[in-house]
């Protein structure tokens, strides 16, 4: 079993980091035989999606040979795509920054949109090709958001991308309100960390 852990927060002592450590330490202890890969997106060279990358992605999908100048771009995207495809389970840890995800996570998700690899086109529309993958989303946000709050574009954003790939087995662990309610901050955080550990036990 291969499990990929994707972290998208470079702030020291962040609540996202605490969530990540609570989950992965519990998971590792209970799954010693798993192949575990940790990917810290802020430590990666990940150019934003642009016209060149879109063109290279199209050529690669069509099997068109790439010139040397485009091979490096293709390598960056394919390395992350193939790593994602190889994983049976994926854990994402990310904060809500300014109503959405960190730009580096947005870029990572852009890399995963690959026709014939993660989705395909049909007369009825897009069909995801990865229905058997299992995902956990670990999210920290200082305020409190209703489940259908349109201003929350972090967890919902990631879920929408995963749904395009056919992934629906998604578990979420959210710590929220620790900035909005500073008098209860520690209690809120500890409760969320305990939930992360419980989810990790059965993930």
From Swiss-Prot:
Cofactor(s) it depends on: FMN
Keywords, ordered alphabetically: Flavoprotein, FMN, NAD, Oxidoreductase
E.C. number: 1.6.5.-, 1.7.1.17
Protein name: FMN-dependent NADH:quinone oxidoreductase 1
InterPro entries for this protein: Flavodoxin_fold, Flavoprotein-like_sf, FMN-dep_NADH:Q_OxRdtase_AzoR1, NADH:quinone_OxRdtase_FMN_depd
Pfam families cross-referenced by the UniProt entry: Flavodoxin_2 (PF02525)
Catalytic activity: 2 a quinone + NADH + H(+) = 2 a 1,4-benzosemiquinone + NAD(+); N,N-dimethyl-1,4-phenylenediamine + anthranilate + 2 NAD(+) = 2-(4-dimethylaminophenyl)diazenylbenzoate + 2 NADH + 2 H(+)
One example GO MF annotation: oxidoreductase activity, acting on NAD(P)H as acceptor
HAMAP family hit by this protein: Azoreductase_type1 (MF_01216)
Organism per entry: Halalkalibacterium halodurans (strain ATCC BAA-125 / DSM 18197 / FERM 7344 / JCM 9153 / C-125)
Organism taxonomic ancestry: Bacteria, Bacillati, Bacillota, Bacilli, Bacillales
Family listed: Belongs to the azoreductase type 1 family.
Record's cofactor remark: Binds 1 FMN per subunit.
Subunit annotation: Homodimer.
Entries under NCBIfam families matching the protein: PRK13556.1 (NF010075)
Function as written in the Swiss-Prot or TrEMBL entry: Quinone reductase that provides resistance to thiol-specific stress caused by electrophilic quinones. Also exhibits azoreductase activity. Catalyzes the reductive cleavage of the azo bond in aromatic azo compounds to the corresponding amines.
